Amino acid sequence: FRLDQWREVKDLLAEYYTFDESLYYSILPTATQYARNSIFSGLMPLQIEKMFPELWVDEDSEEGKNLNEAPLIQTQIERFRKKYTFSYHKVHDSQYNDKLLNIVPSLLHNQLNVVVLNFVDMLSHARTENKMIRELAQSEAAYRSLTRSWFQHSGTLELFKRIAGKGYKVIVTTDHGTIRVDNPEKVIGDKNTNTNLRYKVGKNLNYNPKDVFDIRFPDKAGLPSPCLLYTSPSPRD
């Protein structure tokens, strides 16, 4: 979820909420498995790996990298010696959103409710992988418009409406954004190199060092060290 996307939907909530905005940077790499896990745990990825190895999934593992989000939230609550009652929900589709709307009264008894709206993340990936979505969101203005249309007509807006007026604080945030890259850089690696387009991890990577931000000592950046880790795109993009 990008800042410009937030600006696009903010006025839809203005009737129901007042706003207090703050800006912050995502960690690197700007990928869900690192950035979102860090937000929920309140820790850098390397700290998660060391303190809660059972909750950290290595880069080369075939296991889902974001299956431990609720336990990571629990670790942060316990680390700060709080006794919050909380719930965790990941909204993948409209059916789950409808289910969430039906249980809003019971959720209001919790001190913390965490809701992951996966559509925006799915949209950013589909913009790269799906030809139809590429056509619909071929410009930044079109991308923002698509986000607004979804928000305006989805059950998500209804969820915000039902919470409004109950005296609760709602925090709308994101783990990372997206950048449309017009000048991609080529990073060549062996068969063990990961396939993620946002960043590359590998022992033998060939690239132009002038165009790629590389991290040769991942621990210095708070990252686990399966091998050398490099991130892209380059600053000029």
For each predicted feature, which ranges?
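A long, amphipathic alpha-helix that forms part
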Residues: 131-170
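Short secondary-structure boundary/capping segments
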Residues: 8-16, 128-135, 181-196
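Flexible loop/turn segments at secondary-structure boundaries
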Residues: 2-5, 47, 121-125, 178-182
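His/Asp/Glu-rich, glycine-adjacent segments
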Residues: 28-142
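Conserved small/polar residues in nucleotide/adenosyl-binding loops
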Residues: 230-237
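Segments forming glycine/polar-rich beta-alpha architectures that bind adenosine-containing cofactors
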Residues: 1-28
